[in-house]
Amino acid sequence: MHESQLTTSAAKPSRLGWFDDVLLLGIMAVLAGCGLIYEYLLSHYAGRILGALEAAIYTMIGLMIVSMGLGAFAARKIKDAFTGFVVLELTVALCGSLAILITAAVIGFGQQLPMLIASTLGLPPDQLPEGGMIGTLQKLSEYLPYFWGVLLGLMIGMEIPLIARVRQSLSDEHLLHNAGTIYGADYIGAGIGAAIWVGFMLAIDIQLAAALTASFNLLAGFVFIWRFWQKIQRPKLLLAAHLVVTGVLLLLAIQGPSWEQQFNNLLYKDKVVYAKATRFQQLTFTERLRGNGLSPVYALYINGRLQFSSSDEHIYHAFLVHPTLAASARHNKVLIIGGGDGLGLKQVLRWEPEQVTLLDLDAALVQLFKSPDPDMPERLSQALLSLNGNAFNDPRVTVIHDDAFNGVDKLIAKGDKYDAIIVDLPDPSHPDLNKLYSDYFYRKLKELISNDGALTVQSTSPYHAQKAFISVAKTLALAGFDVKQYHHNVPSFGEWGWSIATLDGKDAQHRLAQLTKLPIADDWLTLGLVKGAFEFPANFYQDATNIKPNELGSLQLYHYHQQAWSETQGLDLF
């Protein structure tokens, strides 16, 4: 009887223990979150480099998903699932932590190469070698994030098949729903990873985020070595390799952000003196020193795109603000949407309004121009406060931090009315920005503007993005406004344009034409410049009938803008 019981017990297949099962599924969930964060990290960085964030995101995610599928097939070639998984996570950790830094170094060197060659050969600054092989190398370097995306995608795609094989090998009986169980953990982990990205990692340095993410891949390798030591080939060697990479990750977490910033600084013409990652965007300030007692030139870049230069920002903001207020019957109550640097606000305050409301999403950006970061160089902080005339500390100013699309609804609900509205938003280079140029948004603003007031929208370049420029006017008209457009040269941007809209009475151009002088004196702007700004080439609007307004959900303006950007920059993602 006793012998029979032993025989029965020996014949019974061993089952996967609950501890190992929970451990493996937990590892799978964590790695899924890491994989999604790598997608976001690389696509976000690629968008900053290429200047086409939305296209970069879709391209990166598409490439990584396809690569993950190929990686799942390639996992068949790995004979030892235990050892293969440990080596895989070690490699993912190393590549994931170094991808951003190496990309920044290569692109930075590519941008500096023409200047290095010119300096070596004694060429003048206006004859930098930028064509031929140098131009090709620079272009190829911009696609390096996609190389990392494909490589990491291949390796991430191997994780699920290997975990599935490990689970099965730990049980003598066939595991029902093995794939479904693992995919369930994978999906949940990916969702958690997305939440971590949005809630935490967007606000920290991108290189630090990469190092932190890679540390979880490395931790998965450590756990496997500890738990399955007897099943792994050369565990001591792999443990030593993990310890070495741990040191690399610590170094990258501490020094990586400053190294990455130094490489990124090579992308700018002038010296980078301050950089900050807010929850919504990357802010970079540059400084160009000038001799002969002239003050330095400061510039702000958001996600790599120039927002203003202190050498000519007054031209842009004078044309944005003064025609608007001059065309308004009153200017006691003014609304500014965007304009978180306070430069337009400074010009508005010159009209002695009773109240100004500024609606901007990024509180961290506004804070830098109100009470600069202690880590910011003193000369820069003083320059910023001087540029905007310390406008944010004026008691007449109310700042609301909210998404403009929803924020204006709250103003409408309160029954607010404004004598003038100035919309100073970034170009519609992203679908989220596109809706702020839609007919629906302009109809909201129609509820806020006084019948005899004026509304002005910065409308991108009429030269580089003609269709987008005209589409803004047609969208305002669709919303019920009487629209005129004007333009002027801003040296840092080239030819730039604005759309000015009214509701009742004469249009803004006629109102301004009746003036004999500007109500306020300006060092740059004259009434003659304002009136002349409404003149366009004879054939400028000849194809306007074929240009569509930007209805909500159509993304029409976004596509016009992206097309113009691609043609101007020679950008082709495929």
Swiss-Prot record:
Give, as one word, the top-level EC class. Answer: transferase
* Pathway where it operates: Amine and polyamine biosynthesis; spermidine biosynthesis; spermidine from putrescine: step 1/1
Query: What is the predominant subcellular site recorded for this chain?
Result: membrane
Instruction: Name the reaction it catalyses.
Output: S-adenosyl 3-(methylsulfanyl)propylamine + putrescine = S-methyl-5'-thioadenosine + spermidine + H(+)
Active site (record annotation): D424
Q: What is its EC number?
A: 2.5.1.16
Please name the PROSITE patterns in this protein's record.
PABS_2 (PS51006)
Which regions span the lipid bilayer? 22-42, 55-75, 90-110, 144-164, 188-208, 209-229, 237-257
* Keywords assigned: Cell membrane, Membrane, Polyamine biosynthesis, Spermidine biosynthesis, Transferase, Transmembrane, Transmembrane helix
Task: List each copy of the PABS domain by range.
Answer: 257-505
Q: Which GO terms describe its cellular component?
A: plasma membrane
According to its UniProt entry, one GO biological process term is: spermidine biosynthetic process
Q: Which residues of this UniProt protein bind spermidine?
A: H317, D341
Q: How does it sit in the membrane?
A: Multi-pass membrane protein
Residues annotated as binding S-methyl-5'-thioadenosine are: Q281, D360, D403, A404
Q: Where is this region: Spermidine synthase?
A: 254-510
Q: Which molecular function GO terms apply here? A: spermidine synthase activity
State its location(s).
Cell membrane
PANTHER family given in the database record: POLYAMINE AMINOPROPYLTRANSFERASE 2, THERMOSPERMINE SYNTHASE ACAULIS5
- What biological function has been recorded for the protein in this entry? Catalyzes the irreversible transfer of a propylamine group from the amino donor S-adenosylmethioninamine (decarboxy-AdoMet) to putrescine (1,4-diaminobutane) to yield spermidine.
Oligomeric state and partners? Answer: Homodimer or homotetramer.
Q: Family per UniProt?
A: Belongs to the spermidine/spermine synthase family.
Q: What is this protein called?
A: Polyamine aminopropyltransferase
Give the organism the record lists. Shewanella oneidensis (strain ATCC 700550 / JCM 31522 / CIP 106686 / LMG 19005 / NCIMB 14063 / MR-1)
The gene coding this protein: speE
